Amino acid sequence: MKRTLLTLSIMSTFGATTVFAQDATYQGAAVDAEIANTCIVRFKDDVSKFDVEGKARGMVAKANAQAKHVYKNTIKGMAVNMSCDKAKSAFAGNSDVMRFTPDGKVYASPAKAKGKPGGGGNPQTTPWSVTRVGGPVNGNGYTAWVIDTGIDLDHQDLNVDASRGFSAFSSGRNAGMDDGNGHGTHVAGTIGALDNGIDVVGVAAGTTVVPVKVLDARGSGSWSGVLAGVDHVAVNASPGDCANMSLGGGFNQELNDAVESAAQQSGAFFVVAAGNESQHAANVSPASASHNRVFTISATDSNDRFASFSNYGNPPVDYAAPGVGILSLKNGGGTTTMSGTSMASPAACAVIMMRNGNPGTDGKASNDPDGNADSIVHL
């Protein structure tokens, strides 16, 4: 939500988790090098969105480089396949450039507690987390944008609309919008799993979920890719939609600015995970983004206790939601249990969407480490 007088300068990194233990070795040397040799070149705000592509094309042609992504709807600029040192040299004196930001890693943000396999099938289960926030309710006619690892496009318990979707991956095994990890499908299930007698039911059952794939099969991605996903949502979402971001990394001004701009332009609500490092959420992005349509969510357990892993701090945290031992969907059918602010954010996303940005609350998180107990969202 709207937060003022907040200066952020501390840098940190979202660590890999044991839920997706392979995150720690994501990418290997080859992809690490690709990220290290990508620079986000931001143009000045007065550059017209209609001129961005032409300017980017001309710049990379002269530098004998390539633009991996071009941003024209939120921030303006591009991600180019060279280090920022080389980019600064190549584009020295270009009056359209505001600044250069090195690309970096972004992760899905489940907690360090290991996920447990669930059952699934018949009969349908209503997760405790859904009940705790006042669900399920009928979400037919509503839309949630899941900015994540993709969604299982053929899942029988989801209403997926891939026609409006996006993938930051244009080639290789991660191309397309299908979920190669399971994280995005779990998130989508919490928001809107169908009330159809199987698996689980979501908070806003039957909500149309749109995959915006910015994380790969190992639950990892890049700032440049996430920016591209947010840029897509900015011009495709409608007022009252919800965009969920259960991901994060170190503090990144470009992403915060993009999320704030996308929320302002589209009229959608952006709901983001606070993160799982037991630190102040002001240190990480997009949790530290500030806008009256951006909501940062901490996590609680089934006894309304503040989750030991959850980031904290008011601002930027706005509300808490259930995030420990959360049952939801897995790829291919059935269910699985995960923990994290990744699981809290989609529950809040559904509530905020159904309440048009004015969620009710029911109780507060006990043992909040910042001493200012977060209110728990409720329909």
Residue ranges: model-predicted function:
Residues S109-K114, V200-V201, S220-V226, M245-D318, ...:
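Substrate-binding/specificity loop regions of serine endopeptidase catalytic domains
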Residues D23-A36, K44-K49, E53-Q124:
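Autoinhibitory propeptides
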Residues A30, K68-K72, V201-A204, P211, ...:
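C-terminal subdomain of the subtilisin-like protease fold in secreted/lumenal serine endopeptidases
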Residues I40-R42, A79, R99-T101, T143-I147, ...:
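Structural recognition of the beta-strand scaffold that forms the well-ordered cores
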Residues G134-R164, A175-G225, S238-D241, A289-R293, ...:
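Subtilisin-like serine protease catalytic core
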Residues Q22-A33, S83-S89, K112-V146, I151, ...:
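N-terminal domain-start motif of subtilase-like serine proteases
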Residues M1-Q22:
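Gram-negative bacterial Sec-dependent N-terminal signal peptides
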Residues G93-R99, D157, G267, H291-T296:
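Glycine-centered tight turns that cap/initiate beta-strands
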